[in-house]
Amino acid sequence: MARSVAFGVAVSEEILGDGASVPIQGGIADGMATAAALGFDCVELHLRNPTEFDATALARLAAETGLRIAAIGTGLEYSLNGLSLTSDDPVIRERAAARMRQHIDLAAPLGAVVFLGLIRGKCGRRARLADCLDRLAEQLAPLAAYAAERRVPTGIEPVAYYFSDLLNTTAETIDFLRRPGLESIGLLLDTHHIHLEERDIEAGFRNCAGRVTHVHFSDSNRRYPGAGAVDFARVARALDAIGYRGAVSLEILPSPSGEEAARRGLARMRELWVPRAGTRAANAPTTAGSGL
């Protein structure tokens, strides 16, 4: 029986520094070659500007390295470009939405998930939280339709309180996605955030059955799995229980170095799945959440 999940790692074009949770930085081509040499099945690409990349060239690079491009991350649009779907400035909101469409366009021919984390923005004031969520839903509904038309799976990420005050728990996120026009959006689940925000990390994953489009493995201290307090065995059990068949990707700090963090993280993931399964994963993404 084939292993149920594909092992992935985050790669960026830019050098983001030691404080960024992307272990392989400084070039997509070189980063994918490194990921392949380390033994990963797939990568997620963290892109500041999707229009700088050609899908055909990326597909060729994937074929050359034997890797699948499992996902495209949009967080750099917020952290480096200052774009937010809930900004008070309507011009910034529209620029953020336009960039999301460009990420979706790039992902479509690659069969990649597009996930949404920090680009949701922050509200900043509890009294305005309902208005901020309404604004986010207003921006996401047309993007969900745009992604669904192009058959691009997507996921919004519940994030810890120190990242954003919008959608911290799985329950909040699932409830938000019940709004009209958002039903096709899936969830990206990150063990670091779930560990901080959920009373029971395994239950947090199980509650999202049928909606999970991508998974991040990151320990409680944002380092590689095994460097902190997250019980990854419980997470692996939960993912198997809900029938998740997508990528499990390392979005971790590059400590003690990017390659070493990735190597140690991959070793821990193999401990969790390979003894119970056996062979290299079939690189087939989950079909849940074909919209943003």
Task: For each feature predicted by the language model, list its residue ranges.
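N-terminal pre-domain/capping segments
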Residues: 1-108, 267-292
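Active-site beta-loop-alpha junctions enriched in small/polar residues
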Residues: 10-16, 46-48, 74-77, 119-121, ...
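Active-site acidic/histidine proton-transfer and metal-coordination neighborhood
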Residues: 22, 26-27, 83-186, 279-283
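Acidic-and-aromatic substrate-binding clefts and catalytic sites of carbohydrate-active enzymes
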Residues: 22-24, 45-57, 123-125, 161-167, ...
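Acidic/histidine-rich catalytic cores of soluble enzymes
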Residues: 42-43, 137-236
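Hydrophobic faces of well-ordered beta-strands that scaffold small-molecule active sites
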Residues: 5-11, 43-45, 69-74, 114-116, ...
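Conserved, mostly hydrophobic/aromatic
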Residues: 35, 43, 62, 96, ...
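Acidic (Asp/Glu)-rich catalytic clusters
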Residues: 1-3, 32-37, 52-74, 102-111, ...
